């Protein structure tokens, strides 16, 4: 029996396949413009890997979970975060999820989600913000963190993503090193997420 978890987020889709109690394989892919098309590609990939979907237990989550017609059940991301964290840690924890379109802070007590806070009103403090800033710098989003380690502290003061982009463009124009701008971007999103988490309250291990 295969147990398959499919998470179609706003920017990326993640798939994990367990055979009984062991992870068999996983893969990720961009969500693209259509979660329905992404779901079809995932289905094709699973079949090509020899997975019999009819004999598998499939759970879908994420923004595009309703686009997975071959799923046996759909579950919210918050519930999945709770169950997954309890499976991995087995103790009380605070989960911080910086997604493509929102940031979630989730409190987990005795294996159950007891509280959560979601910032979905503004792109600032989300993966979209990081993606936009990386594009503005002309670098891959995966390279931002390593670049930031080599930069000097500067402040990205704008709280709005559009204004922050303009601020980054101005910094580039003034000759500020990309590494320092990357550091400012990382510090900016870290500060925003910390403010949300501090207001929410931290319990146990931060995951």
Where are these regions (language model features)?
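Short glycine-rich, Thr/Ser-proximal phosphate-binding strand/loop in the N-terminal lobe
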Residues: 3-44, 115-122
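Short acidic, glycine/serine/threonine-rich loops at helix termini
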Residues: 16-18, 68-72, 105-111, 117-119, ...
């Amino acid at each position: 029996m295969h147990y398959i978890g499919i998470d179609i987020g706003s920017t990326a889709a993640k798939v994990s396949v367990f055979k009984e109690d062991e992870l068999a394989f996983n893969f990720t892919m961009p969500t693209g413009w259509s979660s329905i098309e992404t779901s079809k590609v995932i289905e094709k990939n699973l079949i090509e890997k020899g997975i019999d979907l009819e004999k598998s237990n499939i759970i879908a989550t994420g923004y595009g979970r309703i686009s997975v017609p071959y799923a046996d059940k759909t579950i919210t991301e918050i519930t999945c975060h709770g169950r997954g964290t309890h499976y991995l840690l087995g103790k009380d924890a605070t989960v911080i999820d910086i997604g493509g379109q929102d940031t979630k802070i989730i409190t987990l007590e005795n294996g159950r989600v007891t509280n959560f806070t979601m910032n979905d009103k503004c792109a600032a403090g989300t993966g979209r913000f990081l993606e936009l800033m990386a594009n503005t710098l002309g670098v891959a989003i995966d390279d931002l963190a390593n670049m930031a380690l080599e930069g000097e502290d500067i402040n990205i003061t704008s709280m709005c993503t559009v204004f922050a982009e303009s601020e980054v463009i101005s910094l580039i124009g003034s000759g500020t090193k990309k590494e320092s701008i990357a550091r400012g971007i990382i510090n900016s999103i870290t500060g925003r997420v910390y403010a949300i988490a501090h207001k929410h309250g931290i319990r146990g291990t931060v995951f």
